[in-house]
Amino acid sequence: MTIPSATSLRRFTALVGTCLSLTMNADAAVEKILFNFQTATNSPAWQVVNDDVMGGVSTSQFQVLTNGGAVFSGVVSLENNGGFASVRSAPVRENLNGCDAFVFRVRGDGRRYKFTVRTESGFNAPNYQAEFTTKRGEWEEHRLAFKDFVPTFRGRVLTDVPPLNPANIASVGFLISDQQAGPFRLEMNWVKATGRPN
């Protein structure tokens, strides 16, 4: 019987280690931080867009807190055929190929919200949306798969546009339009995209 030399054993061990490393990396999750509200330098200006653009009187504000985190809050009114308030990020121009979902950490008020995504920056661009419901006063992480986002325009579902294209993300945001009048408050820590490589 031939006994392997010490050099051969070292080479074999190194090869096994390399193979294990490649396997683990292949299975490792992809994660890309889009906004970290715990760090002010990573929280560029966000813009509120409410139903006053169509005659409504809902109000909202978005504030990045000095001690970390951000808050989207306001009052939804159903008067004048209104009923929504929203906030969206400054243009980000992200290529999220390799990811398959958005994940964010928020603390809400028990109301239903939507996470919104645009792939174009124009005012008349489609708005892709996916719903999530918060638990009052509890911090939660919500994961919304790209495939579950529905293209809309001014509240109407579009059937003649392609699915969300993760390679061309122009902006993201939050929307409340649950047809319930009254105050709302959504605190947030961060927004990221995740997935596993093919």
Where are these regions (language model features)?
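Bacterial N-terminal signal peptides that target proteins for export
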Residues: 2-14
